[in-house]
């Protein structure tokens, strides 16, 4: 969707850039309320995920990541805003009367038809196993485990590429730059996730970010020594270290954050680029 640029009529709209308005009128049988527990805190009330809290109430939309309506054509009826993700969602009316939400593929418009199955056309929005796709196909919503539903490349603008097939596995290049193996029987959706211009958004003011449930970020250099390794000093002091550190004292730049000895280490041919 297009990016709407605000005029500088008030300080809050200066340099503001948001998505063009996509209305949301969700179906009652495809939404449910969710209790957002703690907003970044654990059961003891201690902050475990910083910079979270507040935000507008949300209703969760049930998204069909499995695409298990096999060989039944569906029609895109609406393209809606989803407060729980950056990507837009589509309401699909299937031929058997079923109604479901899916991620909006880039370029899909109201009235387009989609289908999922084993021998379906290589068309944007269609879902099929990797073994039936030609090399070089752009895909999203990729399964890791057969039947569990898509788990990879689901963010706005995300796209992966099928680069090889050998034996029981297919080789994919993911949006992060990682190259890994996945079973050829796993399914994926053809095309790229829509709303590719989401990274061009500029909220313009702090209040707009608070509506999203994101709290202010404070630099460690302006904290006290008890709160951050960069804190302390008289006036504007340097961090006092050779290299930047996290609030818990670990190296902030270049340290690997992936858990060691995971079962999928053997499936990763090239780790993600920094």
Swiss-Prot record:
Keyword Plastid: yes
Keyword Metal-binding included in the entry's annotation: no
InterPro entries the record matches: NA-bd_OB-fold, Rib_uL2_dom2, Ribosomal_uL2, Ribosomal_uL2_bac/org-type, Ribosomal_uL2_C, Ribosomal_uL2_CS, Ribosomal_uL2_dom3, Ribosomal_uL2_RNA-bd_dom
GO biological process: mitochondrial translation
Encoding gene (name): rpl2-A
Main location: plastid
GO cellular component: chloroplast; mitochondrial large ribosomal subunit
Species this protein is from: Gossypium hirsutum
Subunit architecture: Part of the 50S ribosomal subunit.
Localization in the cell: Plastid, Chloroplast
Transmembrane segments: none
Listed name of the protein: Large ribosomal subunit protein uL2cz/uL2cy
Similarity field: Belongs to the universal ribosomal protein uL2 family.
GO molecular function: RNA binding; rRNA binding; structural constituent of ribosome; transferase activity
UniProt keyword terms in alphabetical order: Chloroplast, Plastid, Ribonucleoprotein, Ribosomal protein
Stretches for region Disordered: 1-21, 224-274
A Pfam family of this chain: Ribosomal_L2_C
HAMAP family the UniProt entry points to: Ribosomal_uL2_B
SMART domains recorded: Ribosomal_L2 (SM01383), Ribosomal_L2_C (SM01382)
């Amino acid at each position: 969707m297009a990016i709407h640029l605000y005029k500088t009529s008030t300080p809050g709209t200066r340099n503001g850039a948001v998505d063009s308005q996509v209305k949301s009128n969700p179906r009652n049988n495809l939404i449910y309320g969710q209790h957002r527990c703690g907003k970044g805190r654990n059961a003891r009330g201690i902050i475990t995920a910083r910079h979270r809290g507040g935000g507008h109430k949300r209703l969760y939309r049930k998204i069909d990541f499995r695409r298990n309506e096999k060989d039944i054509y569906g029609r895109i009826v609406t393209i809606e805003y989803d407060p729980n993700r950056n990507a837009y969602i589509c309401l699909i009316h299937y031929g058997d009367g079923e109604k479901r939400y899916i991620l909006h593929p880039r370029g899909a418009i109201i009235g387009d038809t989609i289908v999922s199955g084993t021998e379906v056309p290589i068309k944007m929005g269609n879902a099929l196993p990797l073994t039936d796709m030609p090399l070089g196909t752009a895909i999203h919503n990729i399964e890791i485990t057969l039947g569990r539903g898509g788990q990879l490349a689901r963010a706005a603008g995300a796209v992966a590429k099928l680069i090889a097939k050998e034996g029981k596995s297919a080789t994919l290049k993911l949006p992060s730059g990682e190259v890994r193996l996945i079973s050829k029987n796993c399914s994926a959706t053809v095309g790229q996730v829509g709303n590719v211009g989401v990274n061009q958004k500029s909220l313009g003011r702090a209040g707009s970010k608070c509506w999203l449930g994101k709290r202010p970020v404070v630099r460690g250099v302006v904290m006290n020594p008890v709160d951050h390794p960069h804190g302390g000093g008289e006036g504007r002091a340097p961090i006092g270290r050779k290299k930047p550190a996290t609030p818990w004292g670990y190296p902030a730049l270049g340290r690997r954050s992936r858990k060691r000895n995971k079962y999928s280490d053997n499936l990763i041919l090239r780790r993600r680029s920094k």
